[in-house]
């Protein structure tokens, strides 16, 4: 099925966001990296798998198509708790909305017609999810730069998960 209203996330850009900081001065990178290291130290390596598709918002015109976590959600949430605590302790500003772990697959184009958006919504309900499993051994601090061609992500630092 062709869904021209969807802007798919490039495979190399797929990620789970633990905390979104927005613009952060370069001189705070060590603090951000420290917060990531603190979070990673709380959690052992784990398996992450996905089992369902969904959309934001749940009703009305879809804007985001995502995959939901089947296995590993508790570990992702614990990483989020650790990241939030580390960022707060370093007086870093970030979006403190509750973490809703998901993997964004696509966004619905803002100029999509109502019919196209409705087709996307119906397609999500029919989407068969293949088994997707990953071993998670580290987290990364990622810089996102938006451009007309889409976001460009650069890894600035990584932090290995705890090895118990």
Model region roles, listed by residue range:
Residues 1-164:
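Histidine-dependent nucleotide/RNA phosphoesterase domain, centered on the 2H-phosphoesterase fold
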């Amino acid at each position: 099925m062709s869904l021209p209203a969807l802007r798919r996330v490039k495979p190399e850009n797929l990620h789970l966001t633990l905390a979104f900081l927005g613009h952060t001065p370069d001189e705070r990178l060590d603090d951000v990296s420290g917060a990531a290291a603190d979070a990673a130290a709380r959690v052992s390596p784990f398996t992450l798998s996905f089992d369902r598709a969904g959309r934001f918002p749940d009703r009305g015109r879809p804007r985001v198509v995502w995959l939901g976590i089947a296995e590993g959600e508790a570990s992702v949430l614990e990483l989020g708790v650790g990241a939030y605590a580390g960022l707060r302790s370093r007086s870093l500003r970030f979006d403190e909305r509750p973490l809703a772990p998901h993997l964004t697959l696509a966004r619905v184009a803002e100029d999509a017609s109502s019919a196209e958006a409705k087709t996307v919504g119906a397609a999500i309900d029919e989407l068969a999810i293949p088994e997707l499993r990953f071993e998670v051994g580290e987290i990364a601090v990622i810089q996102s730069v938006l451009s007309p061609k889409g976001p460009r992500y650069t890894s600035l630092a990584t932090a290995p998960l705890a090895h118990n």
